[in-house]
Every structure is written in C-alpha cells, then in structure tokens.
Regions:
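Flexible "cap/lid" loop of the alpha/beta hydrolase fold
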Residues: 48, 88-135, 160-164
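Active-site loop/oxyanion-hole signature of alpha/beta-hydrolase fold enzymes
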Residues: 30, 36-72, 88-89, 112-117
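Conserved alpha/beta-hydrolase catalytic His-Asp/Glu region
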Residues: 129-165
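Glycine-rich His-Gly loop
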Residues: 7-10, 76-77, 102
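Conserved HGGG/HGGXW glycine-rich cap/lid loop of the alpha/beta-hydrolase fold
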Residues: 2-43, 64, 72
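Gly/Ala-rich beta-loop-alpha elbow adjacent to hydrolase catalytic centers
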Residues: 74-75, 79, 83
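Active-site signature of alpha/beta-hydrolase-fold catalytic machinery across serine-
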Residues: 19, 85-89
C-alpha cells in the first residue's frame, strides 16, 4: 500500500484531515497528517519568524525522521506551496504530488510571487488586525453545514504573514 503525507492549508491544522484519514487507513495506507508550526494545536508556537521555509522544514523533517520513501504528498490550499518546497529538497522521497484546491507554484515561488494582489490584501489585514505580522482567520472557508461549520470556526487559528512572502 501507499504512504500519504497530508499537508493542510493556511489557518488549519491536521484536524482538517480527520474525516479522510480513517478511509485511507481502512484501505491499508500509512497516513501522516502533521500540523505545521504555529497553527492549530501548535498555536502556542506562533511567532513573526515563522515563514514558508519553517513549514517546508516541518514536512522534510517528518520524511527524514520517519525515513519515508515513495510518499504521496498531498497539499491543500497553502499546503500546495509547502509541498512544492518539500519536493525541491527531497525529490528522491516523493512518488507523487497531489495539489488539492491549491496554487501550483513554480520552484522557489511563494504566494507573493503567484498573486501580488492577494499578498497585498493579506498585508493590509495583518496591519489592521494582526499586529502587523499575523492574519486572523476569516469565516469557515466554504464549509456551510452544521456541525462542520462550528467545528471549523472553533479550530482555525491565525497564520503568520511571513508564510505567504
């Protein structure tokens, strides 16, 4: 069977995969869904220094620590930018990349490179409501049904602006 590493998007954590993981495991797959530094249950680590490279190293570190090879690396939303950085660093460990509702950057690109308008809006949000360095979550990101909507609202956390730059 396959080994999956599921990388969540901005404002989220490994919690967003909890309804998917049982299906993958029931099919006999090995599944890892780490929470990126400073987010969700790791929100106490949130700081202005956390950037995209921090999150790339979170995943590279997992692959090395667990000695994973032949990995199917899934990136949702912002996680797509993270997995692109991961495959740049350890391509020999990755079998497939799956971009799930995400941006698909070229090697070395960040969100600032892909969408200058979005990054400008995020900077404005950080200045207005996030002490100049963090972006607070907004809404439920398309989740409209209860109890999932309430679950998302309880679970999302602030995201460092530097992760998009």
């Amino acid at each position: 069977m396959a080994t999956f590493v599921l990388v969540h998007g901005a404002w989220f954590g490994s919690w967003c995969w909890q309804k998917i993981i049982p299906f993958l495991k029931a099919a006999g797959h090995e599944v890892y869904a780490p929470t990126l530094t400073g987010l969700a249950e790791r929100a106490s680590e949130l700081s202005p220094e956390i950037g995209l490279d921090t999150h790339i190293q979170d995943i590279v570190g997992l692959l090395l620590e667990k000695d994973l090879h032949g990995v199917i690396l899934v990136g949702h939303s912002y996680g797509g930018i993270v997995i692109t950085g991961v495959v740049d660093q350890v391509p020999e460990r990755i079998a497939h990349l799956v971009y799930l509702d995400t941006f698909v950057p070229r090697n070395g690109e960040s969100m600032a490179d892909i969408s200058p308008l979005v990054i400008r809006l995020l900077r404005q949000q950080a200045q207005a409501h996030g002490d100049g360095w963090k972006i607070n979550p907004r809404g439920t990101y398309g989740v409209t049904r209860e109890p999932d909507r309430s679950w998302v609202l309880r679970s999302v956390t602030a995201q460092p602006l530097k992760t998009f730059e």
